[in-house]
Structures are given as structure tokens and as C-alpha cells.
Design a protein with these regions (language model features):
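Hydrophobic helix-cap positions at the C-terminus of alpha-helices
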Residues: 10-11, 72-73, 118-119, 190
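Alpha-helix N-cap and loop-to-helix initiation/capping positions
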Residues: 57-61, 100-103
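Well-ordered alpha-helical segments embedded in enzymatic catalytic cores
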Residues: 6, 65, 111-114
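A cross-family acyltransferase "interaction/gating" segment
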Residues: 27-43, 47-49, 74-169
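A Trp-anchored, charged/polar loop motif used as the substrate-binding/catalytic surface
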Residues: 58-71
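Accessory terminal regions of nucleic-acid processing enzymes
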Residues: 167-208
Length: 208
């Protein structure tokens, strides 16, 4: 939650309003579902492998439905936020994963691949953000009550077209195992660079 607030603060008035994909079922959550809908958050529908095994005629329909839902953004600026680890870092999660990274969980490629598949033609830049909390990861109340004295944010930018042209990502991601392996390897390399940066910051407390 604090990461979201930090990102909104850092990018306020610098990039289009940050949004993130939500499962279609969440539109029915009381109050929040209506708020997300009013704010034009994109809702996605994903079919599981077991569901598609029973209903093979629906293969690809989830992506088609999501692309149609995102058509409104062709004429409206948008930024899509994706937390690639998929969950908050805790030492117990890190240990269970046997993560090869000292400060991070393993990155999951599926979420960002879904965004690129659904909206790749509408997005221009990939903004890679690394957030470091020197005093330890704060709670929501720590942040809003002003008890967080120091936050370090590192930002790097890559053109989406560069990712596409280099073959790092292809639209066949969900059907081609080789594409998935190549994209995951690229993501792992970026995660290693993040981990090295966090290690350096922890060792030197050097401001970004």
C-alpha cells in the first residue's frame, strides 16, 4: 500500500494517472468496485488452464475481451502499474521461494506480459522503479502520519518499442514456451540489477 502512495506522489502531474488491472469479479466489491469503475481502471478476465481444458473454444477470448475493454485508452493517456513480484515481501515468503535475490522475491512475468499483450500498442514507455526504505518498510499509518523520514526512489525508462523490436517480448507469449523463457530471463536480469542496487544502498546508504 505504501509503495502505491509513494508512486502516486513521485509521478503526480509527471505521467498520466496510475491505474492497475483488476480481476473482473472485483467490480462487484461494495464501494471500491464502483470507485475503480468510475476511475476507469481496466478490468480483466483470465481463464485458468483447467477451465480452458474443459472449454477449448474460449481460448484467447479472455485477452480479446480485455483488449476491447482497453480501447477507451486509445484516445486517453494512461499509465498501468504492475507489481511484478505479485505480493508483499516478507522474509518467510523469501525463504519459501528460495529466492536467488538477497532483497527481493522472484519476479513473475505473467502480469507484465498480460499488460503488453493487451495494451502494447497503446503504451510507449516502461518505467522501472526501485524503492528503498532505509529505516525499514513502513506501514500505511507510518507513512500518512509523517513518521517516514527517508525514502529512496530509483527510476529507469525503456521504450516499449525497444522491448518489442528486440524480440524480448512477442504476442505469442502465452502460446510459445520459448518466448516465455526468453522474457522471464530478461526480467530476471533486471531483477538482479535491482538487487545489486539495493545491496549497494544498504552498504553505503548512498542517496539516489
Amino acid at each position: 500500500m505504501v509503495d502505491i502512495l509513494v508512486l502516486q506522489r513521485v509521478f503526480n502531474r509527471k505521467i498520466p494517472f496510475l491505474k492497475f488491472f483488476l480481476k473482473k469479479e472485483l467490480i462487484y466489491v461494495p464501494i471500491l468496485g464502483l470507485a475503480w469503475w468510475a476511475l476507469d481502471f481496466p478490468f480483466m478476465r483470465r481463464y485458468s488452464k483447467s477451465f480452458l481444458a474443459k472449454h477449448p473454444h474460449l481460448k484467447g477470448k479472455d485477452m480479446e475481451t480485455t483488449r476491447k475493454a482497453c480501447e477507451k485508452f486509445r484516445s486517453k493517456p494512461v499509465s498501468i502499474m504492475n507489481f511484478v513480484e505479485g505480493t508483499r515481501f516478507t522474509q518467510s515468503k523469501h525463504d519459501r521461494q528460495a529466492s536467488p535475490f538477497a532483497h527481493l522475491l522472484k519476479p513473475k512475468a505473467g502480469g507484465i506480459a498480460f499488460v503488453l499483450s493487451a495494451m502494447g500498442e497503446q503504451l510507449h514507455k516502461l518505467i522501472d522503479v526501485t524503492i528503498d526504505y532505509p529505516g525499514g518498510v513502513p506501514t500505511f499509518w507510518d507513512f500518512v502520519s509523517g513518521r517516514v523520514r527517508d525514502i529512496r526512489v530509483n527510476i529507469s525508462v525503456m521504450p516499449i518499442q525497444e522491448i518489442m523490436d528486440s524480440g524480448i517480448f512477442q504476442d505469442t507469449y502465452f502460446d510459445d514456451p520459448q518466448v516465455r523463457v526468453r522474457f522471464q530471463a530478461w526480467l530476471n536480469e533486471r531483477w538482479q540489477a535491482k538487487d545489486n542496487l539495493l545491496e549497494e544502498l544498504n552498504a553505503t546508504q548512498k542517496p539516489l
